[in-house]
UniProtKB/Swiss-Prot annotation:
The 26S proteasome consists of a 20S proteasome core and two 19S regulatory subunits. The 20S proteasome core is composed of 28 subunits that are arranged in four stacked rings, resulting in a barrel-shaped structure. The two end rings are each formed by seven alpha subunits, and the two central rings are each formed by seven beta subunits. The catalytic chamber with the active sites is on the inside of the barrel. The active site is at 7 (nucleophile). InterPro entries: Ntn_hydrolases_N (IPR029055), Proteasome_bsu_CS (IPR016050), Proteasome_sua/b (IPR001353), Proteasome_suB-type (IPR023333). This is Probable proteasome subunit beta type-2. It comes from Encephalitozoon cuniculi (strain GB-M1) (Microsporidian parasite).
Amino acid sequence: MITKTGTTIVGMKYKTGVILAADTRSTQGPVVSDKNCVKIHQITDKIMCCGAGTAADASRVARMASRELRLFQNKYLRLPLVSHFRKVCTQHLHKYGGGIGAALIVGGIDSEGCHLYEIHPHGSENSALFVSLGSGSLGAIATLESRYRAMDKDEAIDLACDAVKAGILNDLYSGSNIDVCVIDYSGVEFLRNYRRIGVSENTDTLVYPLDSVRIKREEVFDIVEEY
């Protein structure tokens, strides 16, 4: 069975950089196959992407585009632009007409500034201040639309986590933990399992006294040994 990421992924710009956030649940139909998978992929030193859809497709597209950008960097001795990654992905996906189940959120910083793009499986793309994709994107985008504003790093991380949490709580295919990636001019900071969602606060074990169960009837059977 094909493994899908289910997914709530979020991207947003803040004052000095870009935030990417994603849940960590992977599913096979109605079954949770992985509670702590990684949906944030590194492309270059300052370009990252989140993947939704079929897990293998999203991962392979990210690896393919990363390879193209690194070849460009080694050949021309220039740092690739975020738009270069966007172009490689959209052209590759468009050739297959939606046959590749990969939806991506791309964030990064280059010589032209901070960039955030959403890329859909058919090859369409869009630039945005904030975006959410995946099966839990409805709850996430509602949170972003109601609370997004000019923010510093800590406020942006909190909003991104709250958006993913809203997606998790309204979508059975999203869940477990929240990974966060912060991209700014100093580099990339990846915060693995930054927040856990749905963990029971009551960790006390239940203890039943031995006399808590009443014995209403007792029968004694003789053991018959047969040789």
